[in-house]
Amino acid sequence: MNILGIDPGSRNLGYCILHWDGKKFSLVEAGLLKIKTKELQEQIVELVEGIDIILKAHQIDEVAIEDIFFAYNPQSVLKLAQFRGALSLKILQEIGYFYEYTPLQVKKAVTGNGKATKEQVAFMVKRLLGIKKEIKPLDITDAMAIAITHLQRVKMRKK
């Protein structure tokens, strides 16, 4: 089973694909989609095309996305919501369903502490996946954490 974890942002999208063979999980691929265009509609197209490439390059069984969290800047929330809507539609068209996790759920699942910092989450993700090198930006480790969180739920469903 291949799980795609997504950390959506207004300028970057972190993603991670984990494979679970029923007993253990392994990292297939992780990276960052950087939005380079300036106009909002072009940014949305760039994001959807990028996720389409990822979905078509891998046999994705399930997708997990970080839920939108409250931000102090209403413009940022609106922009992120538009990205999120386009991303959601693409995933629904290709996969048929996706799962959402709040930042609190992800932090708690990976570190045991819902108030963990991004650095603490990154440390635990690298430890769980056996990665020694530094991973930057943290959008990538956030996507890994989202995929790990979903994988924990999948394992509970299988019991």
UniProtKB/Swiss-Prot annotation:
Q: Provide the residue positions that the database annotates as binding Mg(2+) 2.
A: E66
A cellular component annotation (GO) from this entry:
cytoplasm
Q: Needs which cofactor? A: Mg(2+)
Q: What is its EC number?
A: 3.1.21.10
Q: Where in the cell is it found?
A: Cytoplasm
Extract the Pfam families matched here: RuvC
Task: Give residues annotated as binding Mg(2+) 1.
Answer: D7, D139
* UniProt GO MF annotations: crossover junction DNA endonuclease activity; DNA binding; magnesium ion binding
Q: Which reaction does it catalyse?
A: Endonucleolytic cleavage at a junction such as a reciprocal single-stranded crossover between two homologous DNA duplexes (Holliday junction)
Gene Ontology biological process: DNA recombination; DNA repair
Q: Does the keyword Hydrolase apply?
A: yes
- CDD domains for the chain: RuvC (cd16962)
Describe its function.
The RuvA-RuvB-RuvC complex processes Holliday junction (HJ) DNA during genetic recombination and DNA repair. Endonuclease that resolves HJ intermediates. Cleaves cruciform DNA by making single-stranded nicks across the HJ at symmetrical positions within the homologous arms, yielding a 5'-phosphate and a 3'-hydroxyl group; requires a central core of homology in the junction. The consensus cleavage sequence is 5'-(A/T)TT(C/G)-3'. Cleavage occurs on the 3'-side of the TT dinucleotide at the point of strand exchange.
Which family does the UniProt entry place this protein in?
Answer: Belongs to the RuvC family.
Q: What is this protein called?
A: Crossover junction endodeoxyribonuclease RuvC
Organism this protein belongs to: Sulfurovum sp. (strain NBC37-1)
